[in-house]
Amino acid sequence: MNISKTASTQGLELYHAIWELVGVTFFDKSRLANWSSWEHKFDELIDNEESALRYADEMLASLNDTYTERLIAPSTFVSPSSADDLPAADGKSADAATSPTAVDKPDEKPTDVMSALTPSKIGYLRISSFDREDIVELVEAAVAKIANCEGVILDLRGNSGGRMHQAMECCGFFLDQGLLATLKFRHEEGVKIRQYFLNEDQFFLTDEVHGGSSNGITKLPTDLYKRRAPLLFGKPLVILLNRRTASASEMMICALVQNGIAGRVHMVGSAATAGKGIGQADYELFEGKVKLRVTRCHWFAPGGEWLGDCGQTERNAIEPETLVDGDTGPEALKVAADELRKMLCANEASGDTSSDAPGSAPTDSHSAAPAIAN
């Protein structure tokens, strides 16, 4: 007896698996209002896996979400450790903005992380992507090279994001404590709320499920990690950004600005950031034959602001405090250096030397929320 599945049956199973996965993981329930109508819409038309994928793409497009898609290129895929994790917040990262202090060869892609210390003790740190497992270790090594600086330029131009967890962990090099970000996921019992924190000893995240039959709050186990040394805490900081600064890198900016010491954080850029307050997770179906990226969560700044979804429904981007029109790389870097020198001079004039003791308790005065572009 032949028990092998027909091409049509395999195609139907594949299409249905995609429909089911998106239906239980996609964050915005309002866009799933008519999702049930897609379950059997193409049953009579699907005759193999190729046609199943073609119709699945049409189904996914109905969500009007640029980031929920079937992944074609294997190099863009990051396998999640579990359905509740968010290992990859974004798609393939864009190339970093170039800078005159970079040491990349012209025919090579920019390195993900580099740092330099000028003779006048200005530290420069470029992070072009958070989309790799070892990014925190790379940043740690780069930070160590500029730990003796008097002020820092953090270059996040062109950084389209990557792994949210790693981006939040990197905040520990600049901050001593505080709420870093809040994420909201769909959950079978309601909404799962995840928050990232720093304290003197730990980098940790908490998970709570809100809702369910009792409309109560269920606290899940807290994940604790040894924090990274705050080698740059308290030092004047200028952050470089542009229109391609997005998602996890925007999370980092919000955390650094809203937890930073007032008068010691400044943003310079050629335009407002992308305004990508959403995160994606990647999934494999049919033993890796199909790879999907699904918008899984919304994230919020420490102050509660949502940056939007890159303008699909909203775009509430981060505005630079100092605008540099037509920046090609060197222009904004020069302005950033000038702004940093102004802060250093102001601190010297006021006799403020608190940055000499990284890891010491912060003052009570923190920076205002980043300017949001509506």
Predicted segment positions?
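Sequence signature of WD/YWTD-type beta-propeller architectures
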Residues: 2-9, 19-21, 33-34
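Short, solvent-exposed loop/turn elements at domain surfaces
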Residues: 24-31, 68, 132-135, 302-303
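"Short basic amphipathic alpha-helical interaction patches in structured regions
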Residues: 33, 138-142, 168-170
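Extended, small/polar residue-biased N-terminal targeting/export presequences
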Residues: 26-122, 351
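Short, charged beta->alpha transition segments
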Residues: 109-116, 138-142, 223-226
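C-terminal "post-core" interaction segments
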Residues: 8-17, 120-124, 128-131, 144-151, ...
